[in-house]
Amino acid sequence: MLAEFARHGATWMHMVDLDGAKAGRVAQIEIIADLVKKSGLNIEVGGGIRTTEDVDKLFRAGVKRIVVGSLCVSNPDLVNDWFRRFGADSIVLDADNIPRIRTHGWQEESKLSIYDVLDNYPLAKHVLCTDIAVDGTLEGASLALYAQMLKKLPQLEIIASGGVGSIEDIYKLNELGVHGVVVGKAIYEGKIDLAELLNFNNKT
């Protein structure tokens, strides 16, 4: 599938180490390194990143950006240290919403909102927000959520995720001003044509 993405002109791939997210450690480093090498894509990876050793392993494997979720809630001091060491372009904060931030592979709900968490990160540049309430439904993205985030957080590049079921959803998110959109199930189930998606991407 990655070869197909690359053949159509894709440049970025978002990956989640689901085993790592549940285990609380990066669990699939060999597979990730192999995919980076064979695909030729810029790959960002999340799931189970808890230590500086995890981060070092991923960057040594060729990963371009890491996606930090649970730890950005539980240990802002460490994550802010990563911003200083690796730079804002290398880190995406993952703030998943329903309506409070969920952590540990969405198994635990914190007492914090997206805005509570992001207040701790003055160096942040990229924020991924999945609305868990619509994730996997293919019924449309949460436009009101992202509109509110863009208004409150104009300094950040917002990446939307969850609910995207058609190319029209992506047009709507683009019109709002989000920086990027994670699309997965809609491609695999044929709701969005890969060539059409990448043609849109090349125009924007």
Regions found by a protein language model. Give the residues of each.
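Conserved anion-binding
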Residues: V63-D135
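Active-site/ligand-binding-proximal alpha/beta "capping" segment
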Residues: I31-D34, K111-I159
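Catalytic cores of alpha/beta
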Residues: I31, V36-S39, I43-I66, A144-V183
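Short, acidic/polar
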Residues: M1-A6, T51-D56, E108-N120
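Glycine-rich, proline-tolerant flexible connector loops at the mouths of alpha/beta enzymes
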Residues: W12-E30, T130-L138
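C-terminal helical cap(s) of enzyme catalytic domains, especially alpha/beta-barrels
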Residues: D77-F86, I91, Y171-L176, G180-T204
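Conserved beta-strand positions in the central sheet of alpha/beta enzyme cores
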Residues: H14-D17, E44, V67-V68, V92, ...
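Conserved, mostly hydrophobic/aromatic
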Residues: F5, M13, L58, L93, ...
